[in-house]
Amino acid sequence: MAFFEVKELTKSFDDTEVLKGIDFTLEKGEVLAIIGSSGSGKTTLLRCLNYLETPDTGRITVDGKTYFDAEENKSLSESEIRLRRLHFGLVFQQFNLFPQYTVLDNLTLAARLQRCDELKKMYKEKRLTKVEYKQKKSAVRSEFNEKAAALLEKVGLSEKADFYPCQLSGGQQQRAAIARALALTPDILCFDEPTSALDPELTGEVLSVIKGLKSTDSTMIVVTHEMEFAANVADKIIFMANGIIEECGTPDDIFNHPKSPLLQSFLGKSAYTD
């Protein structure tokens, strides 16, 4: 069994079928690039993987464990969905940093709240004494600040920890958003057009960070319009069209030996050259 499997995933909005039976697998440490024209279903697929949308049918497994099953999902509570969502990190097009918090707090807030909820549950279940609960809770901030500092160093933002998002360039904000997604140690990190909101001169710094993550064996799914990036970084590429996977293969398969007329046309319009 592959590390990550998606089987027969479908999603409709009213009478519009957006995903029409999506199937693919991904091994741990691999990078998958998803390409295709606007409206092909790429972003909806990412949103389904992250429980931001609920698929109508299908099954998703992560490391041999069921992450989503259409029948089982009907009985999941909101808290269970939140826990499952932690398997995936998602970096949006528009950064989505909290403007009222510093870069450091943006990285640590969700993780700190998650840990405090876990400690509270352990205390209520009498697995922690009151003294132990208070001691561990008071240590949460320093613990996650230390982890966040290491992540900021990884994305080249160590000196910006105490800055607010409005004080950063677009590229720096997106790098902070990547670090924030990593802070929750997801099994799979997803990117939805991570450079689409950036000026061309800032695109390179964000793509460089993503390339660096590959060297750490991070498993990633990247929806992108950067064909050169997909060709150089991805282990496999999916081309989506009209809600289906029209073609899937290695970068060499997709860019040098495309079979689908739709893919051939798409690559011609993208002006990609090897």
Predicted regions and their residues:
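Helix-to-loop junction immediately C-terminal to a conserved catalytic motif
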Residues: 50
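Conserved signature/switch motifs of ABC ATPase nucleotide-binding domains
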Residues: 163, 184, 216
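Conserved ABC ATPase signature
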Residues: 164-168, 172
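Catalytic Walker B motif of ABC-type/P-loop ATPase nucleotide-binding domains
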Residues: 189-192
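Helix N-cap at the start of a conserved alpha-helix in ABC-type nucleotide-binding domains
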Residues: 200-202
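A short, surface-exposed alpha-helical micro-motif characterized by mixed small hydrophobic
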Residues: 230-232
